[in-house]
Protein backbone atom coordinates (compact mmCIF):
# COMPACT_ATOMS: atom_id res chain seq x y z
CA UNK A 1 0.00 0.00 0.00
CA UNK A 2 1.46 3.36 -1.04
CA UNK A 3 2.19 6.05 1.53
CA UNK A 4 1.60 8.70 -1.09
CA UNK A 5 -0.98 11.27 -0.10
CA UNK A 6 -3.15 13.08 -2.55
CA UNK A 7 -1.66 16.59 -2.44
CA UNK A 8 -4.21 18.32 -4.63
CA UNK A 9 -5.60 21.75 -3.97
CA UNK A 10 -7.75 20.65 -1.04
CA UNK A 11 -6.54 21.43 2.47
CA UNK A 12 -4.59 18.66 4.16
CA UNK A 13 -6.28 16.89 7.06
CA UNK A 14 -4.94 15.23 10.19
CA UNK A 15 -5.65 11.90 8.47
CA UNK A 16 -3.29 12.91 5.62
CA UNK A 17 -0.60 13.82 8.14
CA UNK A 18 -1.06 10.51 9.96
CA UNK A 19 -0.77 8.56 6.71
CA UNK A 20 2.41 10.36 5.63
CA UNK A 21 4.02 10.07 9.08
CA UNK A 22 2.99 6.43 9.50
CA UNK A 23 1.15 7.01 12.79
CA UNK A 24 -2.43 6.95 13.97
CA UNK A 25 -4.71 9.96 13.59
CA UNK A 26 -5.08 9.99 17.39
CA UNK A 27 -1.32 10.49 17.75
CA UNK A 28 -1.45 13.46 15.37
CA UNK A 29 -4.26 14.96 17.43
CA UNK A 30 -2.26 14.54 20.65
CA UNK A 31 0.73 16.37 19.16
CA UNK A 32 -1.31 19.38 18.05
CA UNK A 33 -3.26 19.43 21.30
CA UNK A 34 -0.01 19.72 23.25
CA UNK A 35 -0.13 16.17 24.57
CA UNK A 36 2.98 14.91 26.34
CA UNK A 37 2.58 11.17 25.69
CA UNK A 38 4.27 11.20 22.29
CA UNK A 39 7.93 10.32 21.73
CA UNK A 40 10.22 12.98 20.30
CA UNK A 41 10.90 10.79 17.27
CA UNK A 42 7.19 10.47 16.45
CA UNK A 43 6.57 14.13 17.21
CA UNK A 44 9.28 15.16 14.74
CA UNK A 45 7.90 12.85 12.04
CA UNK A 46 4.43 14.32 12.52
CA UNK A 47 5.63 17.93 12.46
CA UNK A 48 7.76 17.25 9.37
CA UNK A 49 4.77 15.67 7.63
CA UNK A 50 2.55 18.58 8.64
CA UNK A 51 5.07 21.07 7.25
CA UNK A 52 5.36 19.12 3.99
CA UNK A 53 1.58 19.06 3.57
CA UNK A 54 1.16 22.66 4.80
CA UNK A 55 -1.30 21.29 7.33
CA UNK A 56 -2.99 23.82 9.59
CA UNK A 57 -4.87 22.33 12.55
CA UNK A 58 -8.48 23.44 12.81
CA UNK A 59 -8.69 25.90 15.70
CA UNK A 60 -12.27 24.98 16.52
CA UNK A 61 -11.50 21.27 16.58
CA UNK A 62 -8.40 21.87 18.66
CA UNK A 63 -10.42 23.85 21.20
CA UNK A 64 -12.78 20.90 21.61
CA UNK A 65 -9.83 18.66 22.40
CA UNK A 66 -7.95 21.02 24.71
CA UNK A 67 -10.99 22.85 26.12
CA UNK A 68 -9.09 26.04 25.28
CA UNK A 69 -10.33 28.61 22.76
CA UNK A 70 -6.94 30.37 22.50
CA UNK A 71 -8.79 33.68 22.40
CA UNK A 72 -8.08 36.73 24.56
CA UNK A 73 -10.30 39.80 24.71
CA UNK A 74 -8.90 43.31 24.95
CA UNK A 75 -11.01 46.37 25.57
CA UNK A 76 -9.76 49.92 25.29
CA UNK A 77 -10.88 53.44 24.62
CA UNK A 78 -9.72 55.83 21.92
CA UNK A 79 -7.86 53.56 19.52
CA UNK A 80 -7.20 56.69 17.44
CA UNK A 81 -4.63 57.75 20.04
CA UNK A 82 -1.22 56.52 18.76
CA UNK A 83 -0.39 55.34 22.29
CA UNK A 84 -3.27 52.86 22.33
CA UNK A 85 -2.71 51.69 18.76
CA UNK A 86 0.91 50.96 19.73
CA UNK A 87 -0.32 49.05 22.80
CA UNK A 88 -2.63 46.93 20.64
CA UNK A 89 0.15 46.19 18.16
CA UNK A 90 2.54 45.04 20.90
CA UNK A 91 -0.10 42.79 22.49
CA UNK A 92 -0.70 41.18 19.09
CA UNK A 93 3.05 40.72 18.60
CA UNK A 94 3.38 39.01 21.99
CA UNK A 95 0.28 36.79 21.85
CA UNK A 96 0.15 35.72 18.20
CA UNK A 97 3.31 33.53 18.24
CA UNK A 98 1.84 31.74 21.27
CA UNK A 99 -1.21 30.78 19.23
CA UNK A 100 -3.60 33.28 20.81
CA UNK A 101 -6.05 35.37 18.84
CA UNK A 102 -6.98 38.85 20.07
CA UNK A 103 -10.65 39.81 20.12
CA UNK A 104 -10.63 43.61 20.21
CA UNK A 105 -13.35 45.97 21.42
CA UNK A 106 -12.90 49.73 21.03
CA UNK A 107 -15.21 51.36 23.56
CA UNK A 108 -16.67 54.76 22.75
CA UNK A 109 -17.60 55.32 26.39
CA UNK A 110 -15.67 56.94 29.23
CA UNK A 111 -16.84 54.04 31.41
CA UNK A 112 -16.82 50.40 30.24
CA UNK A 113 -20.36 49.06 30.55
CA UNK A 114 -21.59 45.56 31.41
CA UNK A 115 -22.78 44.84 27.86
CA UNK A 116 -19.27 45.48 26.51
CA UNK A 117 -17.83 42.82 28.80
CA UNK A 118 -20.71 40.49 27.91
CA UNK A 119 -19.93 40.94 24.21
CA UNK A 120 -16.37 39.68 24.71
CA UNK A 121 -17.58 36.77 26.84
CA UNK A 122 -19.75 35.61 23.91
CA UNK A 123 -16.51 34.63 22.14
CA UNK A 124 -15.58 32.30 25.04
CA UNK A 125 -12.36 34.22 25.60
CA UNK A 126 -9.97 32.74 28.15
CA UNK A 127 -9.01 36.12 29.53
CA UNK A 128 -9.78 39.82 29.20
CA UNK A 129 -7.31 42.71 29.25
CA UNK A 130 -8.83 46.06 30.21
CA UNK A 131 -6.70 49.07 29.33
CA UNK A 132 -6.79 52.55 30.87
CA UNK A 133 -10.55 52.89 31.41
CA UNK A 134 -13.10 52.94 34.19
CA UNK A 135 -15.36 49.92 34.73
CA UNK A 136 -18.99 50.45 35.67
CA UNK A 137 -20.33 48.56 38.69
CA UNK A 138 -22.21 46.27 36.32
CA UNK A 139 -19.08 45.54 34.28
CA UNK A 140 -17.14 44.80 37.47
CA UNK A 141 -19.85 42.39 38.67
CA UNK A 142 -19.97 40.73 35.24
CA UNK A 143 -16.23 40.07 35.29
CA UNK A 144 -16.32 38.69 38.82
CA UNK A 145 -19.25 36.36 38.10
CA UNK A 146 -17.76 35.08 34.84
CA UNK A 147 -14.70 33.64 36.56
CA UNK A 148 -12.70 34.70 33.50
CA UNK A 149 -9.16 35.91 34.09
CA UNK A 150 -9.02 39.70 33.86
CA UNK A 151 -5.89 41.86 33.85
CA UNK A 152 -5.83 45.64 34.11
CA UNK A 153 -3.29 47.36 31.88
CA UNK A 154 -1.94 50.86 32.54
CA UNK A 155 -4.14 51.28 35.60
CA UNK A 156 -5.32 49.56 38.76
CA UNK A 157 -8.72 49.56 40.47
CA UNK A 158 -10.13 49.05 43.92
CA UNK A 159 -12.82 46.40 44.31
CA UNK A 160 -11.75 44.20 41.40
CA UNK A 161 -9.59 41.29 42.49
CA UNK A 162 -7.45 41.40 39.36
CA UNK A 163 -3.80 41.65 38.52
CA UNK A 164 -2.66 45.01 37.18
CA UNK A 165 0.37 46.30 35.30
CA UNK A 166 0.94 50.02 35.03
CA UNK A 167 3.52 52.77 34.88
CA UNK A 168 4.21 54.29 38.29
CA UNK A 169 2.34 57.53 37.57
CA UNK A 170 2.87 58.94 41.06
CA UNK A 171 6.65 58.67 40.78
CA UNK A 172 6.59 59.93 37.19
CA UNK A 173 4.63 63.05 38.11
CA UNK A 174 6.94 63.74 41.04
CA UNK A 175 10.00 63.61 38.80
CA UNK A 176 8.34 65.79 36.16
CA UNK A 177 7.33 68.39 38.75
CA UNK A 178 10.80 68.39 40.30
CA UNK A 179 12.40 68.97 36.89
CA UNK A 180 10.01 71.83 36.06
CA UNK A 181 10.53 73.56 39.41
CA UNK A 182 14.30 73.24 39.01
CA UNK A 183 13.92 74.87 35.58
CA UNK A 184 12.43 77.89 37.35
CA UNK A 185 8.70 77.44 36.74
CA UNK A 186 6.19 78.61 39.34
CA UNK A 187 2.79 78.94 37.58
CA UNK A 188 1.40 75.59 36.40
CA UNK A 189 -1.57 73.97 34.73
CA UNK A 190 -2.30 70.23 34.57
CA UNK A 191 -4.55 69.13 31.68
CA UNK A 192 -5.35 65.53 32.54
CA UNK A 193 -7.33 62.59 31.26
CA UNK A 194 -10.63 61.52 32.89
CA UNK A 195 -10.72 62.64 36.51
CA UNK A 196 -11.42 59.40 38.40
CA UNK A 197 -8.94 56.94 36.88
CA UNK A 198 -5.98 55.77 38.94
CA UNK A 199 -3.76 57.27 36.25
CA UNK A 200 -5.05 60.82 36.74
CA UNK A 201 -5.34 60.52 40.53
CA UNK A 202 -1.74 59.32 40.95
CA UNK A 203 -0.26 61.88 38.55
CA UNK A 204 -2.08 64.75 40.23
CA UNK A 205 -1.06 63.54 43.69
CA UNK A 206 2.61 63.20 42.76
CA UNK A 207 2.69 66.55 40.95
CA UNK A 208 0.90 68.46 43.72
CA UNK A 209 3.05 67.03 46.50
CA UNK A 210 6.23 68.36 44.92
CA UNK A 211 4.69 71.81 44.43
CA UNK A 212 3.43 71.90 48.03
CA UNK A 213 6.87 70.92 49.34
CA UNK A 214 8.30 73.90 47.43
CA UNK A 215 5.52 76.23 48.71
CA UNK A 216 4.10 76.61 45.19
CA UNK A 217 0.31 76.97 45.17
CA UNK A 218 -0.36 78.23 41.64
CA UNK A 219 -1.72 75.12 39.92
CA UNK A 220 -4.76 75.07 37.61
CA UNK A 221 -6.29 71.60 37.16
CA UNK A 222 -8.34 70.88 34.03
CA UNK A 223 -9.77 67.35 33.63
CA UNK A 224 -10.20 66.32 30.00
CA UNK A 225 -9.93 63.36 27.69
CA UNK A 226 -6.87 61.85 26.07
CA UNK A 227 -7.44 63.67 22.79
CA UNK A 228 -5.98 66.46 20.66
CA UNK A 229 -9.28 68.32 20.84
CA UNK A 230 -9.28 68.23 24.64
CA UNK A 231 -5.78 69.70 24.76
CA UNK A 232 -6.50 72.35 22.15
CA UNK A 233 -9.80 73.57 23.63
CA UNK A 234 -8.57 73.51 27.23
CA UNK A 235 -5.38 75.40 26.41
CA UNK A 236 -7.11 77.94 24.19
CA UNK A 237 -9.57 78.85 26.94
CA UNK A 238 -6.93 78.77 29.69
CA UNK A 239 -4.31 80.87 27.91
CA UNK A 240 -6.84 83.42 26.68
CA UNK A 241 -7.93 84.28 30.23
CA UNK A 242 -4.68 83.61 32.12
CA UNK A 243 -1.54 84.96 30.49
CA UNK A 244 0.56 84.18 33.58
CA UNK A 245 0.63 80.41 33.06
CA UNK A 246 4.20 79.52 32.17
CA UNK A 247 4.08 75.71 32.15
CA UNK A 248 1.48 73.06 31.22
CA UNK A 249 1.83 69.40 32.22
CA UNK A 250 -0.29 67.25 29.89
CA UNK A 251 -1.81 63.84 30.61
CA UNK A 252 -0.71 62.52 27.20
CA UNK A 253 1.39 63.51 24.21
CA UNK A 254 -1.73 63.90 22.08
CA UNK A 255 -3.11 66.40 24.61
CA UNK A 256 0.26 68.20 24.46
CA UNK A 257 0.12 68.48 20.66
CA UNK A 258 -3.29 70.15 20.96
CA UNK A 259 -1.98 72.44 23.71
CA UNK A 260 0.97 73.61 21.61
CA UNK A 261 -1.18 74.36 18.56
CA UNK A 262 -3.63 76.36 20.70
CA UNK A 263 -0.78 78.21 22.42
CA UNK A 264 0.67 79.33 19.12
CA UNK A 265 -2.76 80.41 17.94
CA UNK A 266 -3.21 82.77 20.89
CA UNK A 267 0.31 84.16 20.61
CA UNK A 268 2.48 82.03 22.91
CA UNK A 269 5.89 80.88 21.72
CA UNK A 270 7.12 77.46 22.82
CA UNK A 271 9.24 77.24 24.87
CA UNK A 272 10.06 80.97 25.10
CA UNK A 273 6.66 81.93 26.57
CA UNK A 274 5.25 78.56 27.60
CA UNK A 275 6.82 75.25 28.57
CA UNK A 276 4.91 72.04 27.76
CA UNK A 277 5.48 68.47 28.97
CA UNK A 278 3.66 65.42 27.62
CA UNK A 279 3.30 61.82 28.75
CA UNK A 280 3.82 58.53 26.81
CA UNK A 281 6.59 59.33 24.27
CA UNK A 282 4.54 58.18 21.28
CA UNK A 283 6.43 57.24 18.11
CA UNK A 284 5.16 60.15 16.04
CA UNK A 285 7.17 62.57 18.20
CA UNK A 286 10.14 61.51 16.12
CA UNK A 287 8.70 63.06 12.98
CA UNK A 288 6.46 65.90 14.17
CA UNK A 289 7.79 69.48 14.20
CA UNK A 290 7.36 69.45 17.99
CA UNK A 291 10.44 68.20 19.90
CA UNK A 292 8.28 67.48 22.95
CA UNK A 293 9.72 66.85 26.40
CA UNK A 294 7.73 63.91 27.76
CA UNK A 295 7.61 60.89 30.05
CA UNK A 296 8.29 57.55 28.39
CA UNK A 297 6.29 54.58 29.58
CA UNK A 298 8.09 51.20 29.26
CA UNK A 299 5.43 49.78 26.93
CA UNK A 300 7.29 46.67 25.78
CA UNK A 301 8.00 45.60 29.36
CA UNK A 302 4.48 46.47 30.52
CA UNK A 303 2.87 44.37 27.78
CA UNK A 304 5.27 41.47 28.34
CA UNK A 305 4.47 41.39 32.07
CA UNK A 306 0.74 41.60 31.36
CA UNK A 307 0.90 38.64 28.97
CA UNK A 308 2.94 36.60 31.46
CA UNK A 309 0.41 37.26 34.23
CA UNK A 310 -2.49 36.50 31.90
CA UNK A 311 -1.13 33.13 30.77
CA UNK A 312 -0.13 32.14 34.29
CA UNK A 313 -3.61 32.85 35.61
CA UNK A 314 -5.27 31.08 32.68
CA UNK A 315 -3.25 27.95 33.51
CA UNK A 316 -3.58 28.30 37.29
CA UNK A 317 -6.97 29.51 38.47
CA UNK A 318 -5.63 29.68 42.04
CA UNK A 319 -2.84 32.12 41.17
CA UNK A 320 -2.76 35.14 43.47
CA UNK A 321 -3.35 38.44 41.61
CA UNK A 322 -0.31 40.71 41.42
CA UNK A 323 0.05 44.48 41.10
CA UNK A 324 3.13 45.56 39.14
CA UNK A 325 4.18 49.22 38.93
CA UNK A 326 6.93 49.95 36.41
CA UNK A 327 9.26 52.91 36.19
CA UNK A 328 9.57 55.04 33.08
CA UNK A 329 11.97 57.86 32.27
CA UNK A 330 11.91 61.57 31.51
CA UNK A 331 12.81 62.33 27.88
CA UNK A 332 14.10 65.89 27.69
CA UNK A 333 13.74 67.62 24.33
CA UNK A 334 13.06 71.29 23.52
CA UNK A 335 9.66 72.32 24.89
CA UNK A 336 10.80 73.33 28.39
CA UNK A 337 12.85 76.48 28.91
CA UNK A 338 15.18 77.39 31.75
CA UNK A 339 13.73 80.49 33.44
CA UNK A 340 16.13 83.08 34.79
Feature annotation, model-predicted:
Residues 49, 90-94, 142, 146, ...:
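Alpha-helical structural signal in soluble globular domains
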Residues 24, 70, 126, 186-187, ...:
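Short acidic/polar active-site loop segments enriched in Thr and Asp
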Residues 76-86, 104-112, 155, 165-175, ...:
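Hinge/beta->alpha junction and helix N-cap segments in small-molecule ligand-binding domains
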Residues 20, 25-30, 64-80, 179, ...:
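Short beta-strand segments enriched in small/hydrophobic residues
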Residues 1-9, 67-178, 182, 240, ...:
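Alpha-helical recognition/docking segments in bacterial nutrient-uptake
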Residues 219, 241-340:
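Flexible loop/turn connectors
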Residues 1-69, 337-340:
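N-terminal helix-turn-helix DNA-binding module of bacterial transcription factors
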